[in-house]
């Protein structure tokens, strides 16, 4: 199963514009050269994309308590913010937070588990490779996995190699 995700740094903290307004503008200028390669910055917003088993790119978003994947972005600002993420350091681990909802991503504890969103923080390890791929692993060794159609990402036993990775 492919576990490739992209974390693309969108922009630093914006004081006067809404996140969704800036997101639409910034996303249009993002290139593959903008992907994160080994460092996460505070006050930076990200989109997370993954490749499904049919080699189609999907963008992760919070769909009211469950992480989903979409092959396109919404056109309204309210929905767009659910596609934007931050990564917050919690010592030696990371918490993945959705900007639109403020909820934290929680990977399941076994293969095929749904990826939920909640108020509870889950510590995740980030493993980078030199090509901009990152594996997000929870304490049970589960990583995000795209299903064949990409609509419902789940968890699967991950590795710190490109085949078990996402691009951020």
Model-derived regions: residue spans:
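Bacterial Sec-dependent N-terminal signal peptides
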Residues: 1-22
